[in-house]
């Protein structure tokens, strides 16, 4: 196992440990964590944010090292998207109901709507299924720019939710609008829309690969 693949694999292990840790914290009765000053940022969520940023960077790092050192392997190609989806989708699910998965974050006002999570996770399931079908026919479905943009926007939106709309809430300290009209909320909506568009593009661009065996 080369270095880029080790980095990818370590991201999977770290994500699993994070999920288990957050679950354990969620079942500790009476646990509450302070905020960072007057920022409304929960300290546990801040730690998760730091981990998420580092993990997101390793997603870029392992691919860069693999291409630079000519260490691209089939195992790396398989593990990289698995690591990405495990990291992003687990955080999407965790943040869709912070009062359920993180009852210690009593002041958390930012979250990801359930319908957004359903769209983004369903999109990944559909695209992965299509890729599997195409691979069985010897067809490789390449990532498109919308797919890459989708991942970046998801990571930005997740980061904004973890920081509880910081620093955007300083723009409207006495915001008369509901939370679903905040800057963070629109980042989530944009990521959801891009995810849906990229999924449609994958299906349309590669539809011939799925129709060939019917001829």
Predicted regions and their residues:
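Alpha-helical transmembrane bundles and membrane-interface segments of multipass inner-membrane proteins
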Residues: 1-215
């Amino acid at each position: 196992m080369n270095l880029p693949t080790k980095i990818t694999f370590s991201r999977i292990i770290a994500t699993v440990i994070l999920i288990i840790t957050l679950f354990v914290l969620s079942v500790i009765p009476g646990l509450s964590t302070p905020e960072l000053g007057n920022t409304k940022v929960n300290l546990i969520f801040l730690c998760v944010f730091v981990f998420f940023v580092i993990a997101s960077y390793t997603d870029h790092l392992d691919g860069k090292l693999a291409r630079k050192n000519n260490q691209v392997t089939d195992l790396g190609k398989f593990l990289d998207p698995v690591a990405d989806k495990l990291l992003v989708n687990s955080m999407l699910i965790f943040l869709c109901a912070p009062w359920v998965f993180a009852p210690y974050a009593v002041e958390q006002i930012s979250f990801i709507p359930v319908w957004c999570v359903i769209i983004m996770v369903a999109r990944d399931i559909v695209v992965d299924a299509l890729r599997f079908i195409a691979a069985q026919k010897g067809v490789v479905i390449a990532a498109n720019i919308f797919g890459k943009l989708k991942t970046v926007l998801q990571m930005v939106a997740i980061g904004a939710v973890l920081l509880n709309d910081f620093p955007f809430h300083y723009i409207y300290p006495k915001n008369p609008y509901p939370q679903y009209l905040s800057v963070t909320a629109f980042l989530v909506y944009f990521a959801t829309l891009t995810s849906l568009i990229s999924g449609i593009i994958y299906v349309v661009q590669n539809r011939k690969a799925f129709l060939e065996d019917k001829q």
